[in-house]
Design a protein with these regions (language model features):
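Transmembrane alpha-helices of multi-pass small-molecule transport proteins
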Residues: 49-64
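Short hydrophobic/aromatic, small-residue-rich stretches within specific transmembrane helices
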Residues: 50-54, 174-178, 200-201, 205
Length: 248
């Protein structure tokens, strides 16, 4: 196994990415995937690497969110199976189709979602409950997350908050489900590719595991309005940046 010279830096990237993801419920996969892609790692290997690390970081994060009671059991169950199925299908497709063909549509969706989230803060609209749309959301998010190497939290968390779910439960539940989605995606890609950058996986998960408990504590103490605003801003920036990058 070849150890990349960027490993020490990737530990810091893993810490920062998980801190953002644990506090705001998004950003880990996207941030880590962007770095690996910049380093020239192929999309399928990038997705496998990030999801392998995410199995550990999401596991620690899920336990932390459960401790602080940030998980909504009903929403968790509605997202779980569809999310796993979507992840497996997306991983299978990624092994044969370039990811860049679908990324522009993902970024456009995120831009629209961010505006919905921010409008709820400004207009103070009445919260909505996540009902039958939960399974569809999980399936779509799991599929796109596998294709792009990340994005589950960005799609699921922002959509749930846009529908009126309290940020702490949207973030905690999203982090809990991604553990299973990441595991399914990682195993699917590993079985089809037969290779993975274990040195990068280790670097990302060391940094991420250290940040997870801190992020869960912050989530349970941040006011709902502030957390919602943060989610909207982060999604807008990620969406705008990603769309601009893919179209230029």
């Amino acid at each position: 196994m070849t150890v990349a010279p960027e490993v020490p830096w990737l530990i810091a990237v893993g810490f920062a990415a998980q801190l953002i993801d644990g506090c705001v419920g998004m950003g880990y996969g996207i941030s880590a995937s962007a770095i690996l892609t910049t380093l020239g790692v192929p999309p399928a290997v990038t997705s496998a690497t990030v999801h392998a690390a995410e199995v550990v970081t999401a596991g620690v994060s899920s336990a932390s969110h459960a401790w602080f009671r940030n998980i909504d059991r009903r929403i968790f169950l509605s997202l779980l199976v569809p999310g796993v199925i979507g992840g497996v299908l997306g991983a299978t497709l990624l092994a044969h189709v370039p990811a860049h063909t679908v990324r522009p549509f993902v970024w456009a969706y995120l831009l629209v979602t961010s505006l919905i989230v921010l409008s709820r803060v400004i207009l103070k609209r009445t919260p909505l409950r996540v009902g039958a749309q939960g399974p569809a959301l999980g399936a779509v998010a799991g599929f796109l997350d596998a294709i792009g190497g990340g994005g589950w939290g960005t799609i699921v968390t922002s959509t749930m908050i846009a529908r009126g779910v309290a940020p702490r439960f949207a973030i905690g539940t999203s982090n809990a489900v991604i553990f299973f989605v990441a595991l399914a995606t990682c195993l699917t890609l590993w079985l089809q590719l037969g290779t993975m950058r274990y040195d990068m996986v280790l670097a990302l998960l060391i940094g991420g595991a250290a940040a997870a408990p801190i992020a869960a504590w912050v989530t349970s103490h941040v006011p709902q309005r502030a957390a919602t605003t943060a989610v909207g801003v982060v999604v807008f920036v990620l969406g705008a940046t990603g769309l601009f990058t893919t179209l230029t």
